[in-house]
A protein has these predicted regions:
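A short acidic, Gly/Pro-enriched loop at the edge of an enzyme's catalytic core
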Residues: 164-174
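Conserved class I S-adenosyl-L-methionine
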Residues: 202-227
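Acceptor-substrate binding/catalytic loop of class I
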Residues: 207, 226-244
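Short alpha-helix
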Residues: 237-262, 269-271
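A short glycine-rich, Lys/Arg-flanked "PGG" loop and its adjoining helix->strand segment in the class I
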Residues: 188-199
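N-terminal, positively charged/glycine-rich alpha-helical extensions of SAM-dependent methyltransferases
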Residues: 13-58
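A short SAM/SAH-binding and catalytic strip from SAM-dependent methyltransferases
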Residues: 173-184
Length: 291
């Protein structure tokens, strides 16, 4: 087995260079998921776990955005500036531009659209985009945009493309759920994602941790024994430890920048520093990266 840090650290010499224009797409994985494309909206089928996880993800995103908004409000109030409004409305993503990389059949993309975001779903599999587009078109409550580059709140557009092909565009929120473990050159892919985020924007990631338990659960049990997931869907060698992910983003300067903020907290009118960030946000890089 490779050393635990090999998968990301082997790309460490590339840190500081411009994002590569070459695609990180793994053709074998794209072919695999293209064969499964028609299963995306079968909630008892191949992707049942993703449908269940989607509800948790949406709630997680809401909680994180609320925490960041609360911190920003405290900073603004301490400096006598207009404070941003809290995220209390049901459509808490209203007005946000969101890019969902590796959107598959559109499970998260549709949910975010209903919450008010201007969503662009991107997948390297044209078959996945076909399924996502057809499913969205069947729902009259979803506003499907003709042009992905247009900004229309509570709307949805799909593109059959790689993340690298979007160079030059930026979004308030970028998501990549269960994608990192399916790409070539994960470090270049993550740098690409970082370049697609607007200043002050947010990146949400979800991936498999490379542990014995994850192998047992996602490959031995789900693929080999129960066959609820098609064999070959996952490769344990491509899973990434959370600390590897955090170390990678630290190498980009994200976490040290956060520490600078914590070291110079603004003062309240009575002269006391505002409350420190919640411990989870200190670890996850406030308002930027969530693993």
């Amino acid at each position: 087995m490779l050393p635990v840090s090999r998968r990301l650290v082997q790309h460490g010499r590339l840190i500081g260079r411009a994002v590569h224009t070459a695609s990180s797409v793994d053709p074998s994985d794209i072919a695999h998921f293209s064969r499964l494309a028609d299963e995306w909206w079968n909630e008892q089928g191949e992707f049942a776990a993703l449908h269940t996880m989607n509800r948790v993800r949406v709630q997680f995103m809401r909680e994180k955005l609320q925490e960041v908004r609360g911190w920003d409000r405290a900073v603004a109030e301490s400096l006598g500036r207009d404070a941003p409004s809290p995220l209390n409305s049901p459509d808490f993503l209203h007005g946000c531009s969101m890019l969902d990389i590796g959107c598959g059949g559109g499970i998260l993309a549709e949910s975010a659209t209903r919450l008010g975001a201007c969503v662009t779903g991107v997948d390297a599999s044209a078959d996945n985009i076909r399924v996502a587009s057809v499913h969205a078109a069947r729902d009259p409550s979803l506003h499907v945009r003709e042009r992905a580059e247009d900004h229309v709140p509570a709307s949805l557009a799909y593109l059959a493309a790689s993340a690298e092909s979007l160079a030059g565009r930026t979004y308030d929120i970028v998501t990549a759920m269960e994608v990192v473990e399916h790409v070539n050159q994960p470090a270049d892919f993550l740098r690409c994602l970082a370049s697609l985020i607007k200043p002050g924007g947010h990146l949400f990631l979800s991936t498999m941790s490379r542990t014995v338990f994850s192998y047992f659960l996602t490959i031995f049990l789900a693929e080999d024994m129960l066959r609820v997931v098609t064999p070959g869907t996952h490769r344990h060698s491509q899973y990434i430890h959370p600390f590897e992910m955090v170390d990678f983003f630290r190498s980009l300067g994200w976490i040290p920048g956060e520490r600078d903020v914590l070291a110079h907290r603004p003062l309240l009118p009575n002269g006391t520093p505002i409350a420190p960030l919640p411990p989870r946000l200190q670890y996850e890089t406030r308002g930027t990266m969530y693993v």
